Amino acid sequence: MSSFEDKKTTGITFNIQKYSVHDGPGIRTVVFLKGCPLRCRWCSNPESQRRRIELAYNTGRCLTLTKCVRCVEVCTMNAITRADDDTISIDRALCEECGMFCAEACPSKALITYGTTRTVDEVLNVVEQDSVFYARSGGGITLSGGEPFAQPAFALALLREARRRHIHTAVETCGYASWSDMEPALEYVKFVHYDIKSLDDEKHRSATGVSNVRIIENLRNIRSRFPALKVVVRTPVIPGFNDTEEDIRAIARLTAELEVEYQLLPYHRLGTQKYTFLDRQAPMGEVVLDEQVMTALNAVVAAEHATDG
């Protein structure tokens, strides 16, 4: 596809985060794409899961106590009504992609939208604003999500056009995508963060809603098809799910076999408020991860990779 066609390709993003230092080498701009095939119980970005633009409601900012009903007046779907407690009620079965006039009309920004339709050119024009930092640090653009390959045409066009502009490219993926969508995009990628939650398929299905078979197959495909591509496998350590030496040792052995770096990410509770904004319940509740558990699991990883070396 030509550069002109790639630039006009559109997709839905929910954030563009500048000056990130944890999403690949150097200083990076992370582009978050909406849509994810997994429903991880610990997801800290619930607004990333659905591919469509969504309406969020922060009751703490609402001005209904001052008799403001601008959102009710402009809603074209009759999805918003005033509730008895002087807040508003949103019928999300009726609330669809209607232009989100309610969010535009809300004077206090109690109503906001998660998701913006952008062209590749619009995204990369933002990314290029920090080109001087990339040049000095070895950074660039990272596609994250959600799952970038849930919007395969947009992801491919972004990566291909970024490379045309000499921007270093990275992807953060859960690995659950068709290989036919991943392979052409990976031709334009220099670095991959690859998530593996568990090698126990039954456990994986229970916690994420999908099998891990495709995820493991795609990791092996990447190593065989793109042996020079830098891959770092990461596992979020989740209390009550995979926080055992048995779980982590299994993944550590796989990564040692495939000769890829392996990192553990401690569970955190960031993002729980966003569930409330979307009228959803945060699935994990109040659980916390014991620091001593993380220390022990990191020792397991070090031992397995030391044995491999």
UniProtKB/Swiss-Prot annotation:
Its cofactor is [4Fe-4S] cluster. Pathway: Organosulfur degradation; alkanesulfonate degradation. The keyword Disulfide bond does not apply. [4Fe-4S] cluster 2 binds at C62, C68, C71, C106. It is an enzyme of class 1 (oxidoreductase). SUPFAM superfamilies: 4Fe-4S ferredoxins, Radical SAM enzymes. Binds 3 [4Fe-4S] clusters. One cluster is coordinated with 3 cysteines and an exchangeable S-adenosyl-L-methionine. One of its GO terms (biological process) is alkanesulfonate catabolic process. Keywords: 4Fe-4S, Iron, Iron-sulfur, Metal-binding, Oxidoreductase, S-adenosyl-L-methionine. One of its GO terms (molecular function) is oxidoreductase activity. S-adenosyl-L-methionine binds at W42, C43, S44, G146, D195, I196, K197, H268. Induction: Highly up-regulated in the presence of isethionate. InterPro entries: 4Fe4S_Fe-S-bd (IPR017896), Aldolase_TIM (IPR013785), BssD/PflA/YjjW (IPR040074), Organic_radical-activating (IPR034457), Organic_radical_activase (IPR012839), Radical_activat_CS (IPR001989), rSAM (IPR007197). Residues 22-309 form the Radical SAM core domain. Involved in an anaerobic respiration pathway that converts the sulfonate isethionate (2-hydroxyethanesulfonate) to ammonia, acetate and sulfide. Catalyzes activation of the isethionate sulfite-lyase IslA under anaerobic conditions by generation of an organic free radical on a glycine residue, via a homolytic cleavage of S-adenosyl-L-methionine (SAM). NCBIfam families: PFLE_PFLC. This is Isethionate sulfite-lyase activating enzyme.
